[in-house]
Amino acid sequence: MFPFQPMYPMQPMPYRNPFAAPRRPWFPRTDPFLAMQVQELTRSMANLTFKQRRGAPPEGPPAKKSKREAPQKQRGGQRKKKKNEGKKKAKTGPPNLKTQNGNKKKTNKKPGKRQRMVMKLESDKTFPIMLEGKINGYACVVGGKLFRPMHVEGKIDNDVLAALKTKKASKYDLEYADVPQNMRADTFKYTHEKPQGYYSWHHGAVQYENGRFTVPRGVGARGDSGRPILDNQGRVVAIVLGGVNEGSRTALSVVMWNEKGVTVKYTPENCEQWSLVTTMCLLANVTFPCAQPPICYDRKPAETLAMLSANVDNPGYDELLKAAVTCPGRKRRSTEELFKEYKLTRPYMARCVRCAVGSCHSPIAIEAVKSDGHDGYVRLQTSSQYGLDPSGNLKSRTMRYNMYGTIEEIPLHQVSLHTSRPCHIVDGHGYFLLARCPAGDSITMEFKKDSVTHSCSVPYEVKFNPVGRELYTHPPEHGAEQACQVYAHDAQNRGAYVEMHLPGSEVDSSLVSLSSGLVSVTPPAGTSALVECECSGTTISKTINKTKQFSQCTKKEQCRAYRLQNDKWVYNSDKLPKAAGATLKGKLHVPFLLADGKCTVPLAPEPMITFGFRSVSLKLHPKYPTYLTTRELADEPHYTHELISEPSVRNFSVTAKGWEFVWGNHPPKRFWAQETAPGNPHGLPHEVIVHYYHRYPMSTITGLSICAAIVAVSIAASTWLLCRSRASCLTPYRLTPNAKMPLCLAVLCCARSARAETTWESLDHLWNNNQQMFWTQLLIPLAALIVVTRLLKCMCCVVPFLVVAGAAGAGAYEHATTMPNQAGISYNTIVNRAGYAPLPISITPTKIKLIPTVNLEYVTCHYKTGMDSPTIKCCGSQECTPTYRPDEQCKVFAGVYPFMWGGAYCFCDTENTQISKAYVMKSEDCLADHAAAYKAHTASVQALLNITVGEHSTVTTVYVNGETPVNFNGVKLTAGPLSTAWTPFDRKIVQYAGEIYNYDFPEYGAGQPGAFGDIQLRTVSSSDLYANTNLVLQRPKAGAIHVPYTQAPSGFEQWKKDKAPSLKFTAPFGCEIYTNPIRAENCAVGSIPLAFDIPDALFTRVSETPTLSAAECTLNECVYSSDFGGIATVKYSASKSGKCAVHVPSGTATLKEASVELAEQGSVTIHFSTANIHPEFRLQICTSFVTCKGDCHPPKDHIVTHPQYHAQTFTAAVSKTAWTWLTSLLGGSAVIIIIGLVLATLVAMYVLTNQKHN
């Protein structure tokens, strides 16, 4: 009664009753089916009440607007007059119900914060381009220049800017010109900084991710070309040129700027320009704007269907369809927009193979079933329709069906759908139904009306399709979010169509009756009927629209009555006959399409990891069958891919180059082995042997075997020589009777009676008798010197030539060096320049991208078999027409006997013929679920470097091509080219579901049935479809109208089942593979040459830096093959305090610090990494050098989670202790002393023996 709610005073606290309240009486629970009926009735009454309110609005005044809502401007005096009249009747008119119930729908939504900001900034810096009085696009002023899209025709709505002479840049689809000086102060600023996130434009938020700008679908359209995209500071980051719909979002074609201020254009595939160009349609040789047709369906249905059929291939068909179903002057609710198209159609009856008892003509025949999403939903296409009442008006949760020519309706909750168990019906739209069903091998739909149960079943394997790497059967409550494909629960236009056409004639025997012994035909009210009779040798064929008797015919079997209808479409089903003559066809949008979404996937229990020496043991406990994939981060990945269903243990080897495993849906984990082993390389022989046996088992066994062999040979040779010498010494005395052997000879058993020649006499003898031996003896000392030199060189750590050359070349003003191509590992060096202090340079690659040049060959996806309604000719023959559609097959079958729900279709039994046609087209879900075949070519390399030169740091992106320089703080840096042209991508690659596969796909036009590429499209939206599916038509069954066929299974589906793991899990060198664009990141392969051009301003004079007068280096702790496991302490005395660069010229050690702070006297601690057991390196501090050396021990941890930050040039060699024991075994100082004693004894024996004989 009142337009406002009264305010009542607060009620006092209720009186507390000391007596207990009686128990609440029990009532039986309501029947849930009854509750659903009540809810459906309530919803219907609400809809009816709402329509009545819209049809007869109250005469009272409009609702009183709140203070926050801005009053709308009144247009026209007539509107003001009505407003005044309403004020006069305010007292007597009924209250406005919308005010009481709240404003549920705002006609003018207030712009958001982003839109308001952009509108404010655009007011003086963006100018519309007018064409024939309409806004065709926009021009904006950025950085003192005018930019307008080249494809936008028209004149800028500003006299000054319109008079400017522009230059064209066709590469970027832009025209530009310098604006006058007085306008430059009020222009946009541009920026190349585009971190991932959200930006703003005229229609709200724009998402920037992976180098692409996207907006929600439906935001932005023709006429928005030239609008700027702004960041939070009001700077222009891009200019919009067009867009393309990609599922639930629209990708924008933009022009932006890179780091160098150079214009860059990004255009997604199949992008269309967003200039407001009017699309023209055709009607009876007269063109008209597709959005403004001269007729509409509600007024002229038959003519409207003919108009749509004539423009079915026109690019503006969607605009024409939208305008044709909404007549001018009629406005409907937004919810009706989803259902209005299907009022052009009607349900039909079709043959179902499996009804309740055998086959039948069912009102709910199932045409197709699809379940390709990852959410467990099923999309059905049936002969019945949903969301419409029998008259074609909107009625939610309702199914209408054709029951022998009469369209009836039933609430949707009375329709059941089940597989192995009942399904949950989500929604329906047109011929399509969306439901969630449990697993099963068939799907059945049924309903009961007037004690009659109608059902239809089709064989189809319904199963849950998990996404990710764990084969779960039900969506989990918790887990990780992963990209997936789900069926959209709405009927928005997503670019897929289903083909319609005018229905053929339907036999209806109920229209034929006998009246007074004569055949009488009564067509339904408002429709026509075709009557064909064979009576007394007379053939009758006549179209009637009212009851008519045929005096020549006395039996009902002599006549056939066919229903005719030319103002409704039906689905182009193979279960319906085709209309005679040229069929008017059309197309409507398919609802509930696959769309990109996010699914919750389970996470398998984390594996229990046990580390060993160069090994990892994984103890796995999967909840579902889970994939385990591993690879080595080396040149040969040696990947493994295994599905694990039971608890198990897997052991893997890990190298110093790295190893990666991916368990289920968990992120990848990487491990690196360290050079650890038991024993002590600096201990006793058995400790040394144990240490090296664990590190190098084969080399240790080989070395010990050689040593044992040498010792054995030496002992055997010594024994043999001793025996031989003894026998030679004793023989002369044995041959002499009563000979007495001297005591010393008896002890040593060896003596020589001859006098030794001098060295000169020996050389004289060789010169006179054997000069070759003379020269050989002279060359022996030289050979020994060469051998000793080579042994010393092999046993000592010598700096390689390239390192020496690099250190020598570092003194140049233009500095050149080479760093490893490994992300995250710092490379430090210094520049020595005469008269200046060493300048430290530190370079850390943060990200390295390898982007190949790709060429899209074709796109492949699931195919759909299209079948035309068969053309049936009674009592006659016919021929196939030429075929033009992909893989189209046409065949004529004679002797058919078609039968419909209304009776036999033809009079003849065997003279009838049927033309069956079938062809191949892409699936409705091809836009969301498809694979793209690319050919990859030469790759470009980009490196994101964190560079520090002296005290100046910057982060910049460098093109590693050896040509493109980068300038920062006066330093000019040129990188590349990469030392190797390696790429993880083969010549042929396939992109599917955000992953890349190396796959040798067939060329375009050479696809084979059942294999990848059986259908091929140049782009997802193109019409040049190639198909080869081995489609063969079969003879139709007698008594039925259908088009049977056989066909090879989908090659795309088979490839998805058989495909190997993607490059994300199998690429060598630890590459990380991404898409949009296709690229490989952080591949640890090769090296990057760097050339610096350093200005004088960055150098410091030597006189301004400290000078060390004394320095001593001590290794406090040293662990080799570990991440900065060495600690060196340098005690020094400096001339003054200051900052000095530190560097190791050789590759023996890698320093963590690039510079240190020095006092006049003290010590400094430096951390380093080394792979040497006995590191000995020269440490440069400022201009002074100090030598650091010591012993290193193996690391304690077998496996670590990060790579080693030291040079791999010098691996851990054999320790000095081991060399000492080895040389002691084979020789050394003790052996030399023994040999000396033996020689002294021999000399003494010789002297004594010679004296005895004399």
Curated annotation (Swiss-Prot):
Motif Nuclear localization signal location, chain numbering: 64-68
Site positions per UniProt: Cleavage: W274, S275, R333, S334, A756, E757, A812, Y813
Key word Transmembrane helix present: yes
Domain called Peptidase S3: residue spans: 125-274
Posttranslational mods: Structural polyprotein: Specific enzymatic cleavages in vivo yield mature proteins. Capsid protein is auto-cleaved during polyprotein translation, unmasking a signal peptide at the N-terminus of the precursor of E3/E2. The remaining polyprotein is then targeted to the host endoplasmic reticulum, where host signal peptidase cleaves it into pE2, 6K and E1 proteins. pE2 is further processed to mature E3 and E2 by host furin in trans-Golgi vesicle.
Start and end residues of each stretch annotated as Disordered: 48-118
Modified residues annotated as Phosphoserine in this record: S123
Cytoplasmic topological intervals: 724-756, 790, 1246-1254
Sequence ranges on the Extracellular membrane side: 275-702, 757-768, 812-1224
Domain of life: Viruses
Region named Transient transmembrane before p62-6K protein processing: 735-754
Gene Ontology MF term list: RNA binding; serine-type endopeptidase activity; structural molecule activity
Disulfide bonds: C281-C290, C352-C456, C355-C360, C423-C437, C484-C599, C533-C559, C535-C553, C729-C750, C861-C926, C874-C906, C875-C908, C880-C890, C1071-C1083, C1113-C1188, C1118-C1192, C1140-C1182
Lipid attachment in record (S-palmitoyl cysteine): C729, C749, C750
Other facts noted in the record for this chain: Belongs to the New World alphaviruses that can cause fatal encephalitis. Structural polyprotein: Translated from a subgenomic RNA synthesized during togavirus replication.
Protein name: Structural polyprotein
Species of provenance: Venezuelan equine encephalitis virus (strain Everglades Fe3-7c) (VEEV)
Native organism taxonomy: Viruses, Riboviria, Orthornavirae, Kitrinoviricota, Alsuviricetes
